């Protein structure tokens, strides 16, 4: 009887504990909705009201603080004052800390009595402010949910390409796009600066087929498109704006295919055998022309292309004969080394399975866009030493009204099934270090 009473008493105590614990956990703040999703979240109870101050622990962080203050005012109409010194309740505190686990882009955010943002780099700290803005957007009263996150990206390169060659995209749109990308911690925008239409839609006449090179050019006056282009000053300013927002612009000059803009300008550069959208790789003038074009944009102390990487194209050249395959490989190797001689890292479209040959093509420290496995088998390219960007055309391309690609992305399918480790019909380990 006493044992039964004791058991009942114990059951009541346990039940009471469970109820009180459940109530306790019910008050813990859930993970905030942030894109990309936060890697970790430890919720706490209650909210923190922002004081309206940003406290700097390092003078180097002034630019990050100013960006946060400007964006906060734009979004919410409220001023944030930037100060240094001792933090008070509700302050946003920015600091740097040595933490190898955070890498270049990771950060921590601790919303307690104050909002503490810290990272190993200014870049990482800037991303922390983007998370703070996203959380604030859901709590416009300034009452932020208490809790802590340590957030580190899974992939180094997060972004996309925009085709400004086939269709002119106004500079105002590109500038706005970098801000949108930054808000979601996307860090790379490849700008495709030249391309052309399909001849069959222009009376099968190469000279009438739409083609454009969108950038101001002094080396070859008249090359720049008449239906929309960017001055060099505008393009430099775009890159500066992107840099301020944590985004790298990778400019692309696509050749030796997709090159009708160049051959319309100088007809003798076009291939009579493979079409005028192909540069003639057996003509020495082709190399002189392209060398001069690249020099204009990556040469000198203050080059037009400011970033560490440039894209040299190499997309979809004919492989009809082995002699042209070897010439294509020679061309590819030449322009990898040319841009490297100016201090740039080369990015290129994967084509070396399609153009399989014996002519060596540099692979060390070279990045390859893998868009279609028939052009470049990702397993083989990884073995050869290339760093890969996963951009499978069947899943990630948008070409409105073309019929052979999507008008819109299948967002639900991508969310449920796609990661960068899936490249066409090949699947790699998640976070493979060779997939950027």
Predicted regions and their residues:
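N-terminal secretory signal peptides that target proteins for export/translocation
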Residues: 1-7
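Acidic, contiguous N-terminal accessory segments
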Residues: 6, 12, 23-153, 346-355, ...
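Feature activates predominantly on carbohydrate-active enzymes
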Residues: 101-280, 284-287, 291-309, 338
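Hydrophobic faces of well-ordered beta-strands that scaffold small-molecule active sites
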Residues: 158-162, 189-191, 249-253, 308-312, ...
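Active-site beta-loop-alpha junctions enriched in small/polar residues
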Residues: 165, 194-198, 254-258, 315-317, ...
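Active-site neighborhood of glycoside hydrolase catalytic domains
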Residues: 262, 267-366, 371-379, 383
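Flexible, acidic glycine-rich loops studded with aromatic residues
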Residues: 360-366, 373-436
